[in-house]
Every structure is written in C-alpha cells, then in structure tokens.
Swiss-Prot record:
A GO MF term: D-alanine-D-alanine ligase activity
Keywords: ATP-binding, Cell shape, Cell wall biogenesis/degradation, Cytoplasm, Ligase, Magnesium, Manganese, Metal-binding, Nucleotide-binding, Peptidoglycan synthesis
SUPFAM superfamilies: Glutathione synthetase ATP-binding domain-like, PreATP-grasp domain
Gene name for this UniProt entry: ddl
Manganese among keywords: yes
Protein name as catalogued: D-alanine--D-alanine ligase
Family membership: Belongs to the D-alanine--D-alanine ligase family.
Subcellular location: Cytoplasm
Residues involved in Mg(2+) 2 binding: 262, 264
Lineage: Bacteria, Pseudomonadati, Thermodesulfobacteriota, Desulfovibrionia, Desulfovibrionales
Assigned GO CC terms: cytoplasm
Length: 303
C-alpha cells in the first residue's frame, strides 16, 4: 500500500514525534509498503490532497493537530483510512478536564483537579493540598509537568505551562506506584509497572533518558490487580469512544485504589515505548504491531 506517514507537527512534542516516526517508517518498509512523509510543521495545507492519493495514513503526532482530532477529521473528509481513534474520541481523551468528568461520572477513579483556562491571580490556591502536580490540560509526553511541594512553587509551575499551552490542570500527588496499560483492538494488553529513578517521577526526562525509569512488563502485580487494571482500561477506552489502540496511565495506591490519570490515543511508538513493550509480551514484535494497527484501521474504515 501507499502509506502517508504523518509526523512532526507544530506542538512542543514535535521532536518526540519525528523520532518515533523513523522507527515506524522502517517497520512499514519492512512490511512492503511505500512510505511518504507529511510533516505539518506550521499548517495542514496540502494534507487533503496528499491523503487522497494514499491508501492509508499512519499518524504519529503528539498534541495538536494529531491528538485533538483535527487530522483525523481531515482524513475522514479525504476518505483515507488511518490507525486509531476518530475525531471525537481523540478530542475527549486529549482534554483532561473533559475526560476526567466523563470518567468520574461513570465510576472510574481519577484524582481531584482544578482546571485553569488562563493565568490565575498571583495568590490563587487550588485547595488540593501539597504536593501536587501542574500539567497542561492538553498534551502528552509529560512535557511541562511539574511536581510542586510548597505554595511558593505553584506560580512558576503554572507559568511554565502557560508559556507553552493555553490551559492547565492541577492535581494532588497521590502516593503509589505508576502503572500503564494499553488496549489493542478489543483486548487489554499486559500492564507495565514504572519505577522512576530514585527521588524522581515519570516526567519527560525520565521517559526519554536511558536509565530514567525502570519499566517492568508484565507488571509484577497480583493476578486480581492485573485483571482490575485491564478491566478499567477497557472501560475507559470504550467510554471515550476510542478504537484501534490506546494507553491508560494510572497511580495504584497501597490500599489497592486505582486512579486513572489520562488516556493516550496516539501513544509513543518507538520499538521500546510502552505499548510496543506490552505488545511484545503477547508475542507481537514491532512490525507485527504496526501491521495489526493498519489492519484495525482498515477494518474501521470498512475496507
């Protein structure tokens, strides 16, 4: 097939997108596909024309315009199949303030939060206690994520978010271990337990620096806890109207309470990223995972 590989973009996660796309291109070519790159570095001009002349689009964008559903809407207009979720599900999952309301309404635990659409007053306090996390309302890869332990650290953390993003989310830090779990098709994958380096948390540096975190797959959890993580992951995937694949990130508290932090509709896709690790645990190497995502995308498009 002629595959349009969409990567890069204008978000703060551009470099991550391009790095992952190189491995995807290699896998696509190994599968026998012809690959053309499309990089919406500053705009989406030309995407409709490019998509119309290709059999499939593989999206590897992070943040806008890929995770917010804009590219998916344009591909739908062009009649070009693609992997993963459609426009509505993509938007719902990317917008933490919206997705957290939906998840909580349906009984899925998620940390309390304060949403900010603009810089607050200098003396603003979220009333959530300390420590807490400050992060962009829309975005991934833990960019601009700050752990704030004292009130005087709140304003600089918010400024770091608003310097790059238009909206912020503030959440209390919940003590526990970090767990992530992917979905492929209609199946939850084996969860991963993440142990950041001593004294750190799983931020952008931990994710993309060798040795920044230890990722244990499958997670060394009791069978009933693993089953619970997988059940909640599938429920969240379906509640948000997602398809193809996704990845849910959690904090598992010592008492067994499982708090869903966010759901990613375009999770990292380097061969050593989290979802590819989980797929490998069930016998799918990286090219086989890419082939499965294409198959799911073609099926969703009725091809």
């Amino acid at each position: 097939m002629k595959v349009l590989l969409i990567a890069g973009g204008w978000s703060s996660e551009r470099d991550v997108s391009l790095a992952g796309a190189r491995g995807i291109e290699k896998a696509l070519r190994a599968l026998g596909h012809d690959v053309t790159w499309f990089d919406p570095a500053t705009s989406l001009d030309g995407l409709l024309e490019a998509a119309s002349s290709h059999d499939f689009a593989f999206i590897n964008l992070h943040g806008s315009p890929g995770e917010d559903g804009l590219v998916q809407a344009m591909l739908d207009t062009a009649g070009c199949p693609y992997q993963g979720s459609g426009p509505a599900g993509s938007f719902l999952a990317l917008n933490k303030a919206v997705s957290k309301q939906l998840l909580r309404r349906h009984g899925i635990l998620t940390p309390d939060w304060a949403f900010l659409a603009a810089r607050p007053a200098a003396d603003w306090e979220p009333g959530l206690g300390y420590p807490l996390f400050v992060k962009p309302n829309t975005g991934g890869s833990s960019l601009c994520l700050s752990r704030v332990t004292q009130p005087e650290g709140l304003a600089p953390a918010l400024e770091a978010v608003f310097a790059h993003c238009g909206e912020a989310i503030v959440e209390p830090a919940i003590p526990g271990v970090e767990v992530t779990c992917g979905v492929l098709g209609d199946t939850a994958l084996p969860p991963i337990l993440i142990r950041p380096a001593e004294g750190a948390f799983f931020d952008y540096t931990s994710k993309y620096t060798p040795g920044g975190a230890t990722e244990l797959c499958p997670a060394p959890l009791p069978a009933e806890v693993t089953a619970h993580v997988q059940d909640v992951t599938l429920r969240a995937h379906r509640l948000l109207g997602l398809r193809g694949y996704s990845r849910a990130d959690y904090i598992l508290r010592d008492d067994g309470a499982l708090f869903l932090l966010e759901v990613n509709t375009l999770p990292g896709m380097t061969p050593t990223s989290l979802v590819p690790q989980e797929a490998a645990a069930i016998g799918l190497d990286f090219p086989a995972l890419i082939a499965r995502l294409i198959e799911l995308g073609m099926t969703a498009a009725g091809r």
